């Protein structure tokens, strides 16, 4: 009788264990340190992906870290403090030189300008001669300044150039220490607003569209990609989801609110920057790849660097653009 009871108890316990749900193993998200610049163009995908849960769906937790420009972002990646970064057009020359790889297009921008003061006697590009002009080295705005000088048959020797960081450009321009400066959004619109209209855009990316395409991209170091190519593909997949949301004009106000929160600025300021680029969807990016236009755009960008003397010789765009990653992430 005791043996029978023991058998019955064993069977009962087995049945109970069979129906008790086993708690799912908790998988900790991969924490990524992601570099950005404080503007809409740099943040529209990152903040959308965070707030819509696209990155968490891919197993990531993003820690956003602010930088002033692309070259300093790449330097931070090289010292190991940043995993993934966003860069504007100017820093692409560092990718061409082998310091990083582009794993996804972000957008084609129009955020750079040479800003000038009317009080300094500037109304056209030739008026830059003899003027104090500020710029941030290695940025896309420096390229716009270079093109402006070329169009006016001027050289760097014809102006009084001052190399500064982004925040110094803004304050120096407003104080009158500079007569003109090469900068980018949101500083461009802020200079107009805070100067009471004295400061204006002398020229922008659009004025030089025949020579340069203002490509803005997501980048990673070669070594990081070799170790974590699957991680980068998943990250790109989340970017694509963010594109499909953020590229819809009806969602601009929501994205602008998220950008404003991250930058601690007014929503209206972020919303005013939605004209700084053409915001692509996932299909837009794929169409550019499949048609060969994206490769040609990056080549055009590279040729503009060669023409300006920023790089010495042309290299295949496939050396630094990870087209396969962009394609695979869309599957």
Model regions: which residues?
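Pocket-lining segment of extracytoplasmic ligand-binding domains
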Residues: 89-90, 162, 168-261
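Short, low-complexity disordered leader/linker segments with a strong preference
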Residues: 1-31, 329-331
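Secondary-structure end/capping motifs
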Residues: 226-310
């Amino acid at each position: 009788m005791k043996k029978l009871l023991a058998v019955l108890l064993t069977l009962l316990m087995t049945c109970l264990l069979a129906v008790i749900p086993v708690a799912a193993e908790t998988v900790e998200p991969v924490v990524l340190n992601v570099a950005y610049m404080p503007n809409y163009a740099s943040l529209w995908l990152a903040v959308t992906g965070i707030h819509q849960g696209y990155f968490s769906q891919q197993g990531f937790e993003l820690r956003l870290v602010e930088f002033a420009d692309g070259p300093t972002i790449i330097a931070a990646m090289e010292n190991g403090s940043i995993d993934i970064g966003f860069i504007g057009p100017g820093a692409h020359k560092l990718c061409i030189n082998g310091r990083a790889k582009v794993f996804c297009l972000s957008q084609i921008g129009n955020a750079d300008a040479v800003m000038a003061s009317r009080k300094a006697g500037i109304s056209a590009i030739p008026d830059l001669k003899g003027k104090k002009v500020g710029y941030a080295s290695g940025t896309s705005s420096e390229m716009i300044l270079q093109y402006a000088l070329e169009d006016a048959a001027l050289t760097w020797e014809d102006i009084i150039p001052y190399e500064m960081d982004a925040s110094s450009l803004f304050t120096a321009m407003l104080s009158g220490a500079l007569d003109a400066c090469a900068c980018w959004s949101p500083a461009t619109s802020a200079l107009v607003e805070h100067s009471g209209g004295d400061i204006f855009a002398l020229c922008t990316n659009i004025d030089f569209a025949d020579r340069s395409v203002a490509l803005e991209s997501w980048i990673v170091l070669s070594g990081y990609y070799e170790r974590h190519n699957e991680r980068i593909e998943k990250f790109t997949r989340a970017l694509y989801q963010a594109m499909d949301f953020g590229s819809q004009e009806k969602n601009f106000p929501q994205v602008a609110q998220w950008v404003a929160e991250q930058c601690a600025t007014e929503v209206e300021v972020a919303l005013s920057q939605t004209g700084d680029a053409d915001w692509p969807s996932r299909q837009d990016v794929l169409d550019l790849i499949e048609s060969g236009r994206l490769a040609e755009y990056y080549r055009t960008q590279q040729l503009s660097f060669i023409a300006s003397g920023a790089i010495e010789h042309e290299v295949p765009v496939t050396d630094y653009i990870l087209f396969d990653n962009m394609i695979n992430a869309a599957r």
